[in-house]
Each structure stands twice: as C-alpha cells, then as structure tokens.
Amino acid sequence: MTVSNTVDQYTVLSGDRSKIKDLLCNRLTECGWRDEVRLLCRTILLEKGTGNSFTVEQLITEVTPKARTLVPDAVKKELLMKIRTILTENESEIEDAEEP
Amino acid sequence: MPTTPSAQGSGNQNTATSQQIVNNFRELIKDPKSLDEAVNYMYQTLLDDAVAGIFIETHHLRKTGNLSALDGVAEDSTYRICEMPNLDIFGISTAKKPMDCTCPNCDRLVAAARFAPHLEKCMGMGRISSRIASRRLATKEGSSAALLHSGGNAGGTDDEDDVDWSSDKRKKKSSQSSRNNGSKKNNGKTF
C-alpha cells in the first residue's frame, strides 16, 4: 500500500475529499487563481493557432506546472494546514470512537 | 436466488477492506513524515484536479466556438470611452467654449443666444428697434433732445446697453460691484 493509494481511498471513504476539494476551489476562485489560469489557457490556445491538432493533454502538460506556481503562498499554506487538520481530526475521531 | 450470497459476500468484503483502509490510514498518520507526504499529496492531487477542470472548461468553450465569442469583436478606437481628466467620455474638453458671434454690423462680440435679437435691433429692423425710434425722433424733433434722454432706453444709452449683450457675465458683475464699492466709498467720504 503506497501513501497515495491509502490517502486516496481513505479520503474518498470518509467524504473528506469532497470537503477539501470544495474548500480548495473556493479559495482559488476567491484569490483569482482560476481567472489567471483561464487566461493562461486562452493565451496558449491563441498562440498555438486555430489548428485542431492541439489536444487537452498537451495543454495540461504545458500549463499545469505554471498553474502550480501561480497559487499564492498564503492560500497554499492555508490549504496545507486545513488538509492536515482535517486528516488528523479524523484520526482523533477514530480513536475516540474506539476508546469506549 | 444465486445472487444473494455473492452480494452478501462482496458486502462483507467491502466492510473488511474499508476497515483495512482505515487501519492503514491510521498507521500512516502516526508518522509525521508520512503525514506531511500525505498532506502534500492531497494538495497536489486536488490542485491538479482543479487545473484539469479549467482545461476541460476551456477546451469545451473552444470546441463549441464560445471562446472566440467571449473574446468578442475588437472595439473601434473612435468609440472607446475616454477616461482622461477634464474630458468627457468622447474625449472632448468639458471646458465651456466661448459661444460668441461677431455682429457684422457693429463688429461687437455678442452671445450666440442673443445674437438674433441684437442683430434685429442693431440693423434697425422691427417695430421696437430703439435705433429707428431714436433716428425718427432725432430727425423730426431735433429740438427735444432733453426729452429723449429723460425717456431712458432711447438715444445715447443704446450703445451702453449693447455691452450687456455679450456673454461675459463676470464683467457685468465686476462692474456692478465696482459701482457699489464706489457708492460705498462715496458714502464713506460724505459721512
């Protein structure tokens, strides 16, 4: 069992995944990251011209690294903290449930 | 029914595996290093998901042709709204223009709104023209000049009245105030 597998399975199971995802989406929309990435996509599409040869996969490989760096540090820190608290929260809940 | 036992079996298996997942997760969380790893992994995955969402949105817009529609047609620069100080939205100065016209008869500056009545009087048209009246009076009753001046609006006062036809209200006011000051001064001297 790898870390990624375990985390994926557990977060999906407990429903934390959608919770964290909602939070992330809200924060990113609030700080304007969404619009920035959208603009980036558009400019790249315009650069590549009108040819239909450009696929979504190509776009993803090109823009994903840039999109990651575009996230403001404050938002990134906050999200990491939130994810950590949510994950550890569950652990304590499990312990609480098992104790009695 | 052959399906029920298998369904029950799979259900049992599910509960077993979910318990297993929880246990695995708990083991993982206990180690702070792997917790960090897990947190970072979660963040990266969800961020990538968000990015992918935007990509697909953009791709969909492009394929349906809405992307170019969102860009719209480039605006003509002549119709662009101007945002300079002291200019209106068309880029024209908001300062008041002098709307004076030069009277072709007497070469005096007259406000545009008053030009027509001025011209009428100046050229001696119409019944109430003071110039015509004064001319008539002057030719017919040249001896009764004193009466004319006492009449007020006729004769020599005509030109002085024409100064008021120009648009400069400041001049008017200043002249009035100077008159007032003068009268006050005079009053002061007399008292």
Curated annotation (Swiss-Prot), chain A:
GO molecular function: C2H2 zinc finger domain binding; chromatin insulator sequence binding; TFIID-class transcription factor complex binding; transcription coactivator activity
Keyword annotations of the record: Activator, Chromatin regulator, Cytoplasm, mRNA transport, Nucleus, Protein transport, Transcription, Transcription regulation, Translocation, Transport
GO CC terms in record: cytoplasm; DUBm complex; nuclear periphery; nuclear pore; nucleoplasm; SAGA complex; transcription export complex 2
Gene Ontology annotations of biological process type: heterochromatin boundary formation; mRNA export from nucleus; poly(A)+ mRNA export from nucleus; positive regulation of transcription by RNA polymerase II; protein transport; transcription elongation by RNA polymerase II
Cellular localisation: Nucleus, Nucleoplasm; Cytoplasm
Main subcellular location of this protein, as a coarse class: nucleus
Record text on subunit structure and interactions: Component of the nuclear pore complex (NPC)-associated AMEX complex (anchoring and mRNA export complex), composed of at least e(y)2 and xmas-2. Component of the SAGA transcription coactivator-HAT complexes, at least composed of Ada2b, e(y)2, Pcaf/Gcn5, Taf10 and Nipped-A/Trrap. Within the SAGA complex, e(y)2, Sgf11, and not/nonstop form an additional subcomplex of SAGA called the DUB module (deubiquitination module). Component of the THO complex, composed of at least e(y)2, HPR1, THO2, THOC5, THOC6 and THOC7. Interacts with e(y)1. Interacts with su(Hw) (via zinc fingers).
Chain's role: Involved in mRNA export coupled transcription activation by association with both the AMEX and the SAGA complexes. The SAGA complex is a multiprotein complex that activates transcription by remodeling chromatin and mediating histone acetylation and deubiquitination. Within the SAGA complex, participates in a subcomplex that specifically deubiquitinates histone H2B. The SAGA complex is recruited to specific gene promoters by activators, where it is required for transcription. Required for nuclear receptor-mediated transactivation.
PANTHER family the record matches: ENHANCER OF YELLOW 2 TRANSCRIPTION FACTOR
Family statement drawn from the similarity comment of this UniProt entry: Belongs to the ENY2 family.
Protein's recorded name: Enhancer of yellow 2 transcription factor
Organism: Drosophila ananassae
Lineage: Eukaryota, Metazoa, Ecdysozoa, Arthropoda, Hexapoda
Swiss-Prot record, chain B:
Skewed-composition ranges (Low complexity): 175-191
Keywords: Activator, Chromatin regulator, Cytoplasm, Metal-binding, mRNA transport, Nucleus, Phosphoprotein, Protein transport, Transcription, Transcription regulation, Translocation, Transport, Zinc, Zinc-finger
Single GO molecular function: transcription coactivator activity
Highest taxon of source: Eukaryota
GO cellular component: cytoplasm; DUBm complex; nuclear pore; nucleoplasm; SAGA complex
Transmembrane segments: none
InterPro entries, per database record: SAGA_su_Sgf11, SGF11
Single biological process term from Gene Ontology: regulation of transcription by RNA polymerase II
Gene3D superfamilies per the UniProt record, alphabetical: Classic Zinc Finger (3.30.160.60)
Region described as Disordered: 146-191
Keyword check for Manganese: no
Residues modified to Phosphoserine: S167
Record's subunit section: Component of some SAGA transcription coactivator-HAT complexes, at least composed of Ada2b, not/nonstop, Pcaf/Gcn5, Sgf11 and Spt3. Within the SAGA complex, Sgf11, e(y)2, and not/nonstop form an additional subcomplex of SAGA called the DUB module (deubiquitination module). Interacts directly with not/nonstop. Interacts with the AMEX complex component xmas-2. Interacts with Cbp80; important for promoter recruitment of Sgf11 that is not associated with the DUB module.
Protein purpose: Component of the transcription regulatory histone acetylation (HAT) complex SAGA, a multiprotein complex that activates transcription by remodeling chromatin and mediating histone acetylation and deubiquitination. Within the SAGA complex, participates in a subcomplex that specifically deubiquitinates histone H2B. The SAGA complex is recruited to specific gene promoters by activators, where it is required for transcription. Required for nuclear receptor-mediated transactivation. Binds independently on SAGA to promoters in an RNA-dependent manner.
Note on domains (UniProt): The long N-terminal helix forms part of the 'assembly lobe' of the SAGA deubiquitination module.
Family listed: Belongs to the SGF11 family.
HAMAP family linked: Sgf11
Name recorded for this polypeptide: SAGA-associated factor 11 homolog
Lineage start: Eukaryota, Metazoa, Ecdysozoa, Arthropoda, Hexapoda
